[in-house]
């Protein structure tokens, strides 16, 4: 630049800094560059997403500075890639939005989406616990940026958040192969940021993330736990650019936005701009459906009772079910089995059970008998439908102990209690479990019954 061009540019920056907030100046103005002023036309290099801001907010500053330095009106041409700047006289840009020219776009680098192609909506098992999350994910995949932006999905580990993130990306890519999509964990985003800072290549990082069509960030809580203020600042700016340009953002977390205590408040606020949905652990029917789907990957026959047994053993997340199938596969392979019985499954998963080996040899009838003796009711009454208070308590305690002390599936336990549904067994189990946390006398009663059964 000539000395006069330097003077013009410095005056313009000083004026903008006086009139704009510090954050606005830092984001929209600080990293722009004056290429040249020729024939009263200033060629200014900036990111394409900032052009509209300059046209709306900087034109008056340019006009004032132009008359002060050049005693003339200075018009503007905005360019987005310095390598494409022409030596010929540029087309003028002004505030007349009815005469917009075609925008130049940066030469974007090749992007690896890092999507896992095996995760799709077709193989995601829906249940009541994830129905809203699936519906919202399908909506943003069908129309990225048009609704629910950002989409924030939270829940415990192993419940399908990563699956949904990838399913969104895979569907968008299927519908639009040219779409720029990036799946990344928050921790890897932090690592990329640190690397680009160390190499002094932040422009590359901005070019990569601020020109996406869909950004999918997994485990965003890591940004609060492990990042510096500078990392959160960069993500804040990236979020703003994408959101302002109606580009889709989807985030997952192990907690809802309000519980991200170490996250900057302005980020938490933005996370809540769109839709927040929760995924909870799958119910029994969903676990059966998940297992039925996943055993298709194995060359073994799983009878229905084995599937129901496994579904009754793990109720916290899908990863436990997947791990159980791997354990069973190992045992079946070593023994060269074709059919996985309940007994084989019980032996294979024994080490995986948190509370150690179950007493698989204890008959449910023995539990019913001891509970009946303690509460002075008959086994026949426990199995029947009579609902007097002492019988109901005895029945629920017996169901609780059958769940705790045996490896029987919920449907099998229900069958032993007069053909009751598995949901009745689960309700009884949860009720007694909750009562034990508050009722010391009940805990003593159940411990006494357990000792007699053993």
Swiss-Prot record:
Residues 1-83 are annotated as: Domain I, interacts with DnaA modulators. Residues 114-332 are annotated as: Domain III, AAA+ region. Belongs to the DnaA family. Residues 83-113 are annotated as: Domain II. Residues 333-454 are annotated as: Domain IV, binds dsDNA. InterPro entries: AAA+_ATPase (IPR003593), Chromosome_initiator_DnaA (IPR001957), Chromosome_initiator_DnaA-like (IPR020591), Chromosome_initiator_DnaA_CS (IPR018312), DnaA_C (IPR013159), DnaA_dom (IPR013317), DnaA_N_sf (IPR038454), P-loop_NTPase (IPR027417). It is found in: Cytoplasm. Coiled coil: none annotated. The gene is dnaA. ATP binds at residues 158, 160-162. This is Chromosomal replication initiator protein DnaA. GO terms for molecular function: ATP binding; ATP hydrolysis activity; DNA replication origin binding; lipid binding. Domain I is involved in oligomerization and binding regulators, domain II is flexibile and of varying length in different bacteria, domain III forms the AAA+ region, while domain IV binds dsDNA. One of its GO terms (cellular component) is plasma membrane. GO terms for biological process: DNA replication initiation; regulation of DNA replication. It comes from Streptococcus thermophilus (strain ATCC BAA-250 / LMG 18311). SMART domains: AAA, Bac_DnaA_C. Oligomerizes as a right-handed, spiral filament on DNA at oriC. Keywords: ATP-binding, Cytoplasm, DNA replication, DNA-binding, Lipid-binding, Nucleotide-binding. Plays an essential role in the initiation and regulation of chromosomal replication. ATP-DnaA binds to the origin of replication (oriC) to initiate formation of the DNA replication initiation complex once per cell cycle. Binds the DnaA box (a 9 base pair repeat at the origin) and separates the double-stranded (ds)DNA. Forms a right-handed helical filament on oriC DNA; dsDNA binds to the exterior of the filament while single-stranded (ss)DNA is stabiized in the filament's interior. The keyword ATP-binding applies. The lineage of its organism: Bacteria, Bacillati, Bacillota, Bacilli, Lactobacillales. Its main location: cytoplasm.
